[in-house]
Amino acid sequence: VIKRIKKTGNFANRFAIELLNKAFDKQLNILYETTFGNIETAINLLDAFKEKQYQIYVIALPINIELSILRNQQRYESKISAGNTLPRIVEREVIERMAVNYQQCLEQLRQDKYIHLYQIKDHQEVNQIVRSILQNNG
């Protein structure tokens, strides 16, 4: 059973964890999307899957810091235009730090023999990786 991480007290996190625990109880296959920007969060999440004896496949997407900054700016401007939500801009340093944390997290996960880590370098690799996972799984 996953417990809420102290640093993350938002509704979305609590809701996701409740759904995940229900899926564990029903022994469902689970697809979980996360940024893995924090190794503690990643380990907490993956340990829960290991305890339940799940096969774990991590598909890591490439990082493009400049594109992340551009999309952040576009979201900010879109929210200002909409006028119905509070816009929030993430500073460049925060995005860069998250990118470094993500890479460090992947390096640590790569060392774990219970985790099948696939790193996508370009979109052409996606089908190849999916075929590989399906062949290894069944």
Residue ranges, per PLM feature:
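Conserved nucleotide-binding/hydrolysis micro-motifs of P-loop NTPases
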Residues: 37-38, 62-67, 124-126
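A signal for specific C-terminal beta-sheet/loop modules enriched in small/flexible residues
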Residues: 48-53, 57, 132-138
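Hydrophobic anchor at the start of a short beta-strand
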Residues: 30, 53-56, 117
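Conserved nucleotide-sensing/catalytic segment adjacent to the nucleotide-binding pocket
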Residues: 1-50
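Conserved phosphate-donor/acceptor-positioning beta-strand/loop module used by diverse small-molecule
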Residues: 50-72
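Conserved GTP-binding G-domain of TRAFAC-class P-loop NTPases and closely related GTPase folds
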Residues: 70-138
